């Protein structure tokens, strides 16, 4: 697979390039801020950079007719509308977290929200001090899965890649569901899985849930 990376000089960009290359894929498009180096036409473009790069990413996908894997966080509704519009021209998969474990928890919460609808619920999340968006995209994914108004408690400390806990409580019991990211490598592996999955998909807007659904069938 020929792929491109937006933000290839960043921590995630370097890790994505390394992970994909180790699988035998070939990076043919390197993008970072005002720098663009293109060797060939990428079949898939991967963007885990900043939301400010979105317009550039969309233009490159259109120009090269490349499918897209995008894990950037902090998008507005307007940004998501831009991606919906792009999905009419290419296949794209968008998620605020490409960890398999996180996406499994989303599915669990989808099934629990009716059973625990009368329980109190709060989400606690911790990320590294350089993370700009608050609350995290992952916490918002969990909140959406719960389908009710939930308070999110956010902290930005040290170099923690990601730590999330959802608490459910009534007068006699406490249930906690937790996920801790030990290494950013899980995001790169998830992006690789998504890129290989979407390579030959028809135009459309996909999420990680579509990958899980296909694997469970």
Curated annotation (Swiss-Prot):
Primary location recorded for the protein, binned into one broad class: cytoplasm
Localization per record: Cytoplasm
GO molecular function annotations of the record: 4-hydroxy-tetrahydrodipicolinate reductase; NAD binding; NADP binding; oxidoreductase activity, acting on CH or CH2 groups, NAD or NADP as acceptor
UniProt family annotation: Belongs to the DapB family.
InterPro entries: DapB_C, DapB_N, DapB_N_CS, DHDPR_bac, NAD(P)-bd_dom_sf
Binding locations of NAD(+): 7-12, 71-73, 95-98
Assigned keywords, A-Z: Amino-acid biosynthesis, Cytoplasm, Diaminopimelate biosynthesis, Lysine biosynthesis, NAD, NADP, Oxidoreductase
Presence of keyword Glycoprotein: no
CDD domains per UniProt: DHDPR_N (cd02274)
Active-site residues annotated for this sequence: 127, 131
One GO term (biological process): diaminopimelate biosynthetic process
One GO CC term, this protein: cytosol
Binding-site residues for (S)-2,3,4,5-tetrahydrodipicolinate, renumbered to this chain: 128, 137-138
Catalytic activity: (S)-2,3,4,5-tetrahydrodipicolinate + NAD(+) + H2O = (2S,4S)-4-hydroxy-2,3,4,5-tetrahydrodipicolinate + NADH + H(+); (S)-2,3,4,5-tetrahydrodipicolinate + NADP(+) + H2O = (2S,4S)-4-hydroxy-2,3,4,5-tetrahydrodipicolinate + NADPH + H(+)
Enzyme class: oxidoreductase
Summary of the function given for this chain in its UniProt record: Catalyzes the conversion of 4-hydroxy-tetrahydrodipicolinate (HTPA) to tetrahydrodipicolinate.
HAMAP family xrefs: DapB (MF_00102)
Pathway the protein acts in: Amino-acid biosynthesis; L-lysine biosynthesis via DAP pathway; (S)-tetrahydrodipicolinate from L-aspartate: step 4/4
Protein name: 4-hydroxy-tetrahydrodipicolinate reductase
EC number from the UniProt entry: 1.17.1.8
């Amino acid at each position: 697979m020929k792929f491109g990376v937006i933000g290839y000089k960043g921590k995630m960009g370097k890790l994505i390039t390394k992970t994909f290359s180790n699988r035998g894929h070939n990076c043919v498009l390197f993008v970072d801020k005002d720098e663009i180096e293109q060797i060939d036409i990428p079949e898939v473009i991967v963007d885990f950079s900043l939301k400010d790069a979105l317009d550039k990413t969309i233009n490159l996908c259109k120009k090269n007719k490349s499918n897209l894997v995008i894990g950037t966080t902090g998008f507005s509704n307007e940004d998501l509308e831009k991606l919906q519009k792009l999905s009419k021209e290419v296949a794209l998969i968008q998620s605020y977290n490409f960890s398999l474990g996180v996406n499994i928890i989303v599915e669990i919460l989808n099934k629990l929200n009716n059973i625990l609808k009368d329980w109190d619920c709060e989400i606690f999340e911790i990320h590294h001090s350089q993370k700009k968006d608050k609350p995290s995209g992952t916490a918002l994914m969990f909140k959406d899965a719960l389908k009710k108004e939930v308070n999110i408690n956010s902290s930005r400390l040290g170099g923690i890649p990601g730590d999330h806990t959802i608490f459910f409580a009534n007068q006699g019991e406490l249930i906690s569901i937790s996920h801790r990211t030990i290494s950013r490598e899980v995001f790169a592996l998830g992006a690789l899985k998504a890129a290989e999955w979407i390579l030959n998909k028809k135009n459309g807007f996909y999420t990680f849930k579509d990958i899980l659904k296909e694997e469970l069938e």
